[in-house]
Amino acid sequence: MKQIFVVYETDAWHSTSHRDCAGVFTSKWAAVNAIVKNHRIELDEFFDDEEIEKTSKRVLEAEVRRRLRKELEFAYQTQGYETNYDIEVWNINEWYLAKY
């Protein structure tokens, strides 16, 4: 059985009516990397204004990537942001792939 990992970008409430497919991947690692590299979560959702002013944008972005990667390590979704990401795992039978 093969698995594919479908990433959805959604709103703060994970509602299905505001959910867009952001990509399809062959591994969870690839899906997490895509979210971490291409997320649309603002820095002010992670840090207060004082921290943003004192620290370089590059350092802040690296910390955001680390936090997202850690959050997605066990869970298949982000929570608590204005824009969230869900990872769905789809199991596909081998016979289906061979047939089509």
Report the location of each language-model feature.
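Short acidic, gly/pro-rich beta-turn/loop elements at beta-sheet edges
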Residues: 17, 33, 97
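Short, intrinsically disordered, low-complexity terminal segments
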Residues: 19, 28-31, 59, 72
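Short aromatic-glycine-(Arg/Gly/Cys) micro-motifs in beta-strand/loop hairpins
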Residues: 1-21, 37-38
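Short, mixed-charge low-complexity intrinsically disordered segments
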Residues: 37-100
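Small side chains
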Residues: 22-23, 75
